[in-house]
Design a protein with these regions (language model features):
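A generic beta-sheet turn/junction motif
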Residues: 11, 21, 53-55
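Structural detector for short beta-strands of small beta-barrel domains
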Residues: 1-11
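Short aromatic-glycine-enriched beta-strand elements
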Residues: 13-17
Length: 71
């Protein structure tokens, strides 16, 4: 599982960008979310996700908000 931050949300097409802690950027679509709706996401929000290569770079999937410490 990777950890990163949502850097950009495109609300009109329901997709966005995530940057991991190593600086790699991955795109994602609303279908890649796990137990959260696209409208609940915020830019600069910390998230956990899986990543795989795609024709457009990297694709993030199984995206979910990073659990707060102690939970």
């Amino acid at each position: 599982m990777h950890v990163g931050t949502i850097t950009k949300l495109f609300h009109d097409k329901e997709h966005g960008l995530i940057r991991d802690k190593n600086g790699e950027e991955a795109h994602f679509h609303k279908h890649c979310l796990w137990n959260i709706q696209f409208k609940e996401l915020l830019e600069k929000q910390a998230v956990e996700f899986e990543i795989q290569p795609s024709t457009k770079g990297f694709l993030a999937f199984h995206i979910r908000p990073l659990a707060a410490q102690g939970q």
